Design a protein with these regions (language model features):
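Hydrophobic, aromatic-enriched alpha-helical segments typical of multi-pass transmembrane helices
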Residues: 1-220
Length: 220
């Protein structure tokens, strides 16, 4: 693995951290309720200033996920180029769609604020939701697909990763984040609003750790 591939892993880790910070600003509330995709009442607990900060941080950082997925795919590549290329294409497409999703959250949130202030915008909120929520479902479906590739490739033992890394697939980690929230744990309240980013922070961190002795300078 070249130093360049390793650098892209750090970029992926940085993306997960920044988008996670932005999404935390956009969606975290100590009262929970982030699962409400009809009325989005939890947005009333979040100030317009915090929403604006989260919007810009997350949207500007989200495209860096594509670089991070290139890092993961290059570490899977020794196990088979076709599947590693499919892993990258699916992951990159998913996070391009995910950027569109997170870029619309600010506008949904401010519409909720206007409704709370007395504006008759319920139909507009419904329209926003109908054109926003499908994007995150595409992202979640993509996580299932890349996780299948992840498990298959790593389990064969020919990638840059040790076989135990197969356990830490994005889908399994994401399911763990959801379980922590819906089982009412204290940590779940914090990780659920940023579940996708917390998942990938773990994936990129483990990738960098598991391949830490493999970096070399490329002379090609």
């Amino acid at each position: 693995m070249t130093n360049w591939v390793r650098l892209t892993g750090w970029i992926g880790l940085f993306a997960a951290l920044l988008v996670g910070l932005g999404e935390f600003c956009l969606q975290y509330t100590p009262n929970g309720g982030v699962e409400d995709v009809e009325n989005y009442l939890y947005f009333n607990d979040i100030s317009a200033e915090r929403l604006s900060l989260g919007h810009f941080i997350s949207v500007l950082a989200a495209p860096l996920y594509l670089i991070g997925y290139w890092h993961l795919s290059k570490n899977l590549e020794p196990g088979g180029k076709f599947l590693s290329s499919a892993f990258f294409c699916i992951g990159a497409y998913a996070f391009a769609v995910g950027t569109a999703w997170i870029g619309q959250r600010f506008f949904i949130a401010t519409t909720v604020h206007e409704i709370a202030a007395g504006a008759d915008l319920k139909s507009q909120l419904t329209l926003f939701a109908e054109h926003n929520e499908p994007f995150v479902n595409v992202l979640r479906l993509a996580m299932v697909l890349v996780s299948l590739i992840w498990i298959i490739q790593i389990s064969r033992g020919r990638t840059n990763y040790p076989r135990w890394m197969a356990i830490f697939s994005p889908a399994l980690l994401l399911a763990t984040m959801f379980a922590l929230y819906f089982f009412g744990t204290a940590v779940g309240l914090y990780v659920f609003p940023v579940a996708m980013n917390a998942t990938h922070f773990i994936v990129f961190a483990l990738s960098l750790w598991a391949t830490r002795g493999q970096a070399q300078v490329s002379h090609s």
